[in-house]
């Protein structure tokens, strides 16, 4: 690896994230080259199995268990009480999906057999009090939501993804015009 790189970007899941963090430190890169990455690299489901090698890693994701909002605090507290662990992106996503579905079903008074009405309700509802913050769907059915920049820190003896910045209302197109963006050719190897 060239010595003048600004950072290493890692997007890993599960065991691979654990191994990578250890190897990053063992190879002497921690403290010398910034580590940035996708949120699953340091998700709360793997943090309990990591040590100080993860401290300082900066990742981006639409959820952090340490998000300081009333909705997330209530969710994280209830989750921890029931499952004896910190909620992860995966558990929060399932919870949010469930709240979304309930809101849509309520919006159509339970008429789930009316497929068109259910799909329209799923596209148009905006459930409140989601742990991750506000979410809505764009015209293409993809989420517009906050993306949190998180840094791994040790707080009260536990590793956590501390939110250090927020990009509000991020869509699949980021800052690009959707019409222009969709005219581009598909990615291909």
Where are the regions that the model predicts?
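Extracytosolic ligand-binding ectodomains
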Residues: 1-189
């Amino acid at each position: 690896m060239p010595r003048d790189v600004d950072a290493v970007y890692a997007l890993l899941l599960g065991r691979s994230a654990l191994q990578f963090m250890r190897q990053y430190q063992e190879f002497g890169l921690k403290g010398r080259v910034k580590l940035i990455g996708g949120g699953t690299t340091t998700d709360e489901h793997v943090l309990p199995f990591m040590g100080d090698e993860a401290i300082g890693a900066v990742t981006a994701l639409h959820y952090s268990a340490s998000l300081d909002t009333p909705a997330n605090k209530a969710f994280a507290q209830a989750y921890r009480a029931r499952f004896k662990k910190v909620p992860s992106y995966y558990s929060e996503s399932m919870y949010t999906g469930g709240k979304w579905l309930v809101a849509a079903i309520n919006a159509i008074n339970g008429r789930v057999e009316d497929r068109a009405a259910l799909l329209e309700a799923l596209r148009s509802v905006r459930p409140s009090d989601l742990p991750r913050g506000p979410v809505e769907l764009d015209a293409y059915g993809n989420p517009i939501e906050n993306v949190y920049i998180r840094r791994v820190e040790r707080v009260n003896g536990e590793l956590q993804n501390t939110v250090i910045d927020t990009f509000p209302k991020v869509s699949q197109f980021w800052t690009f015009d959707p019409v222009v963006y969709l005219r581009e050719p598909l990615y291909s190897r």
